[in-house]
Regions:
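A structural micro-motif
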Residues: 3-4, 57, 78
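Flexible loop/hinge segments that line or gate small-molecule binding clefts
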Residues: 65-74
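Short beta-strand elements at the ligand-binding edges of bilobed clamshell
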Residues: 74-86
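Hydrophobic alpha-helical
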Residues: 12-66
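Short beta-strand elements in bilobed, periplasmic/extracellular small-molecule ligand-binding domains
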Residues: 1-17
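Hinge/cleft segment of the Venus flytrap/periplasmic-binding protein
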Residues: 84-127
Protein backbone atom coordinates (compact mmCIF):
# COMPACT_ATOMS: atom_id res chain seq x y z
CA UNK A 1 0.00 0.00 0.00
CA UNK A 2 1.53 3.30 -1.05
CA UNK A 3 0.54 6.65 0.46
CA UNK A 4 2.34 9.62 -1.07
CA UNK A 5 6.01 8.79 -0.47
CA UNK A 6 5.43 6.12 2.16
CA UNK A 7 5.19 2.48 1.16
CA UNK A 8 3.70 0.24 3.85
CA UNK A 9 4.18 -3.49 3.67
CA UNK A 10 3.11 -6.16 6.11
CA UNK A 11 5.19 -9.32 6.03
CA UNK A 12 3.23 -12.05 7.82
CA UNK A 13 5.73 -14.89 7.39
CA UNK A 14 8.72 -14.00 9.52
CA UNK A 15 11.20 -16.66 8.45
CA UNK A 16 14.30 -15.26 6.75
CA UNK A 17 13.54 -16.76 3.33
CA UNK A 18 10.02 -15.24 3.21
CA UNK A 19 11.30 -11.84 4.34
CA UNK A 20 14.08 -11.84 1.75
CA UNK A 21 11.67 -12.84 -1.04
CA UNK A 22 9.21 -10.08 -0.12
CA UNK A 23 11.90 -7.43 0.24
CA UNK A 24 13.55 -8.44 -3.01
CA UNK A 25 10.21 -7.96 -4.81
CA UNK A 26 9.61 -4.60 -3.10
CA UNK A 27 13.09 -3.26 -3.90
CA UNK A 28 12.75 -4.46 -7.50
CA UNK A 29 9.43 -2.62 -7.93
CA UNK A 30 10.50 0.49 -5.98
CA UNK A 31 14.11 1.32 -6.75
CA UNK A 32 13.94 4.69 -4.96
CA UNK A 33 13.56 3.36 -1.40
CA UNK A 34 15.88 5.32 0.90
CA UNK A 35 14.60 4.54 4.41
CA UNK A 36 13.24 1.33 5.91
CA UNK A 37 11.45 1.39 9.26
CA UNK A 38 10.75 -2.01 10.83
CA UNK A 39 8.13 -1.69 13.55
CA UNK A 40 9.15 -4.76 15.52
CA UNK A 41 12.22 -6.46 16.94
CA UNK A 42 12.89 -8.53 13.78
CA UNK A 43 14.85 -5.71 12.19
CA UNK A 44 17.90 -8.01 12.18
CA UNK A 45 16.26 -10.16 9.50
CA UNK A 46 15.71 -7.09 7.33
CA UNK A 47 19.30 -6.04 8.10
CA UNK A 48 20.51 -9.42 6.84
CA UNK A 49 18.75 -8.76 3.52
CA UNK A 50 20.06 -5.17 3.33
CA UNK A 51 23.60 -6.37 4.05
CA UNK A 52 23.60 -9.29 1.61
CA UNK A 53 21.94 -7.32 -1.20
CA UNK A 54 24.16 -4.25 -0.63
CA UNK A 55 21.21 -1.84 -0.48
CA UNK A 56 22.08 1.73 0.48
CA UNK A 57 19.25 2.65 2.85
CA UNK A 58 18.78 4.03 6.32
CA UNK A 59 17.46 1.21 8.50
CA UNK A 60 15.48 1.87 11.68
CA UNK A 61 14.05 -0.74 14.00
CA UNK A 62 13.16 -1.67 17.54
CA UNK A 63 14.74 -3.33 20.54
CA UNK A 64 18.10 -3.77 22.18
CA UNK A 65 18.70 -7.37 21.14
CA UNK A 66 22.09 -8.98 20.51
CA UNK A 67 21.46 -9.62 16.81
CA UNK A 68 20.17 -6.07 16.29
CA UNK A 69 23.22 -4.58 18.00
CA UNK A 70 25.54 -6.73 15.87
CA UNK A 71 24.02 -5.26 12.70
CA UNK A 72 24.18 -1.79 14.21
CA UNK A 73 27.88 -2.24 14.97
CA UNK A 74 28.39 -3.30 11.32
CA UNK A 75 26.69 -0.09 10.18
CA UNK A 76 23.67 -1.81 8.64
CA UNK A 77 21.10 -0.73 11.25
CA UNK A 78 21.27 3.04 11.76
CA UNK A 79 18.85 3.55 14.65
CA UNK A 80 17.13 1.38 17.25
CA UNK A 81 14.17 2.53 19.30
CA UNK A 82 14.38 1.00 22.77
CA UNK A 83 11.39 0.93 25.07
CA UNK A 84 12.74 -0.11 28.49
CA UNK A 85 10.75 -3.35 28.87
CA UNK A 86 11.71 -3.85 32.52
CA UNK A 87 10.39 -0.40 33.39
CA UNK A 88 7.20 -1.10 31.43
CA UNK A 89 6.65 -4.34 33.32
CA UNK A 90 7.40 -2.68 36.65
CA UNK A 91 4.91 0.15 35.99
CA UNK A 92 2.22 -2.37 35.06
CA UNK A 93 2.72 -4.43 38.20
CA UNK A 94 2.87 -1.36 40.46
CA UNK A 95 -0.34 -0.06 38.91
CA UNK A 96 -2.05 -3.42 39.48
CA UNK A 97 -0.77 -3.63 43.06
CA UNK A 98 -1.92 -0.09 43.91
CA UNK A 99 -5.33 -0.80 42.42
CA UNK A 100 -5.81 -4.09 44.28
CA UNK A 101 -4.24 -3.06 47.59
CA UNK A 102 -5.42 0.55 47.82
CA UNK A 103 -8.27 0.77 45.29
CA UNK A 104 -6.27 3.41 43.44
CA UNK A 105 -7.62 4.26 40.00
CA UNK A 106 -5.68 2.78 37.10
CA UNK A 107 -4.33 5.37 34.68
CA UNK A 108 -5.61 4.51 31.21
CA UNK A 109 -2.58 6.13 29.58
CA UNK A 110 0.90 6.18 31.07
CA UNK A 111 3.61 7.62 28.87
CA UNK A 112 6.94 5.82 29.02
CA UNK A 113 10.30 7.11 27.84
CA UNK A 114 12.00 5.70 24.78
CA UNK A 115 15.65 5.76 23.86
CA UNK A 116 17.12 6.16 20.39
CA UNK A 117 20.31 4.17 19.93
CA UNK A 118 22.98 4.72 17.32
CA UNK A 119 26.25 2.96 16.63
CA UNK A 120 27.99 5.69 18.63
CA UNK A 121 25.92 5.44 21.83
CA UNK A 122 24.84 1.78 21.95
CA UNK A 123 27.90 0.64 23.93
CA UNK A 124 26.86 2.88 26.82
CA UNK A 125 23.18 1.91 26.89
CA UNK A 126 21.67 0.12 29.87
CA UNK A 127 18.33 -1.45 29.06
Amino acid sequence: KKTDNILKIDIRDTDLKSIEKCLNNIFTEHKDIRIVFVTNSRVSKVAHFIDSSKKDVILIGYDFLKENIEYMDKGIIDFLVCQKPKQQGYRGLISLYQHLAFSSPVEKIYFMPIDILTKENSAFYRN
